[in-house]
Amino acid sequence: MSGIRWRLPVLVAVLATTLGLVAAPAQGASPEKQTSPAVSVAAGKVNLGYFVQWGVYGRNYHVKNIETSGSADKLTHINYAFGNVTNGGCAIGDAYADYDKYYDAASSVDGTSDTWDAGALRGSFNQLRKLKAMHPGLKVLFSFGGWTWSGGFGQAAQNPAAFAESCYNLVEDPRWADVFDGIDIDWEYPNACGLSCDTSGFSAFPTLMSALRSKFGSNNLVTAAITADGSDGGKIDAADYGGAAQYVDWYNVMSYDFFGAFDADGPTAPHSPLTSYTGIPAAGFNSDAAIQKLKSKSVPSSKLLLGIGFYGRGWTGVSQSEPGGAATGAAPGTYEAGIEDYKVLKSSCPSTGTIAGTAYAHCGSNWWSYDTPATIGGKMNYANQQGLGGAFFWELSGDTSNGELITAMDGGLN
């Protein structure tokens, strides 16, 4: 599995990091955090979306868009992506976007401008605080790691208690303790290779998650985004996900990015197949294979969320309409070659067929695969039939302005 290769903050985000890498107490405590037990999967199906930190720049996607699209009414949880993992601990990845960016009345989710008062919270954290006030049942988790920032987990695993302490102190910083209801760990990948290779060992992941659960307690959510590589001897087999399941509220199974133009010559294949199909380029690279393998490792179905991509992956130089064709490289994309948002593809390259529970499209010399409202409906039926805890998606800005895809998820789960 390729991992989510496009989790790259823009340059201004990197520069803004210098404004404050780690959290520290500041003037003015945040509103009192609710201490009622975290919402469990048993309370209803989870419909979780990732909100990306860097989306406030080039993508011009803000917390207000979650509200105006109608998505906030359909979400149960939001994962804020990402915090960094460095020097054995959790750290702020972009201080400006997170808690300093000024929102005027027109751009603020509740129509009230930020203030420059000493100790006042701004940025996406304050916008999320306001969104939660508008939707009292909505929960927000702070997600750490991701494709780009997973290299620090190896050091963190050497002293899990210190890592957990660092993360707790950051998530529960008095300035924004009321914003977050828990922590999400996106380690790509324990005891396997992602952007870098980890050699922490089979048991490192459950040891880390145990430390986090011990520190965060039962009143906070502790979750993890995990690989969907269901191949024999693949990434699911590399770490003890079964052993760690007792410590998490659920796993976000990243059942997308199985295939893409990172294999520039093809063969073309859907990046998020629900099942296998004749001619699939790699055995075990499909959602069902991952779900069944995790179940076989004694992970409860109710602790598994099916992953949906709100984007497509594509090739160019393709003459064959059906999957399995040769290509010459990555299709052009708005932000990165080989990747495009659903909101663009639905019009620029409409679906021409389906396979293995997902859609594909051949337009000109380009070939794309992505999920549509119809294929998402089928995937939600699968999630229900398998007794899964719900579903999640990467990520909010890829949907249409009226939330077509999240509406399909909500309707399918409920």
Residue ranges and their predicted role:
Residues 125-129, 164-171, 202-213, 241, ...:
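Generic structural signal for well-ordered alpha-helices
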